[in-house]
Amino acid sequence: MTILKTKELKIIQRLAKVKKSIQAVSYEYSRFDAIDNKNIYEIKCREKFYDKVLIEFDKYSFNLIYAQTFNKNFLYVVEMDKIYIFNISKLYMFDYNFNWEWKDLPNQTEFNKKEKIKKLVGYIDISQAIYEINK
């Protein structure tokens, strides 16, 4: 039983056309949304287009170490005007500058929680996408 939101599940279904073995994770507290034999996937849906997508350091660091430990790639999938796929493992390997900074952001974006906390975040230029899928 997966607890992913409908939008994330639709993105996984779209990715399954290219990544045949992709599966949504079913563990409620997983720090990533999908997995296959070579990759783990963190999926984000954004209402607006950004030329630099935001990634939270806690997701970045955990998923990067998890991927390295289990010999996988960490792919960050962001839906905006298109679906953009970033290989975070490769960006790390090539010393990509994420321009990490502390920002006041909502504690959770779901459930309309307005409380803000400081989060360490970085940015990925969309030119770094390894793959794009039209909506």
Task: Identify the meaning behind each predicted range.
Residues 17-20, 36-39, 70-72:
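Short glycine/proline-enriched coil/turn segments at helix->beta-strand junctions
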Residues 2, 21-24, 45-92:
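Catalytic cores of nucleic-acid endonucleases
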Residues 1-28, 83:
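Acidic-basic catalytic patches of nuclease active cores, encompassing PD-(D/E)XK
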Residues 34-49:
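Conserved catalytic cores of phosphodiester-cleaving nucleases, focusing on short active-site segments
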Residues 20-26, 79-135:
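Non-catalytic C-terminal interaction segments of nucleic acid-processing enzymes
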Residues 14, 52-56, 99:
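A short linear-motif detector with a strong N-terminal bias
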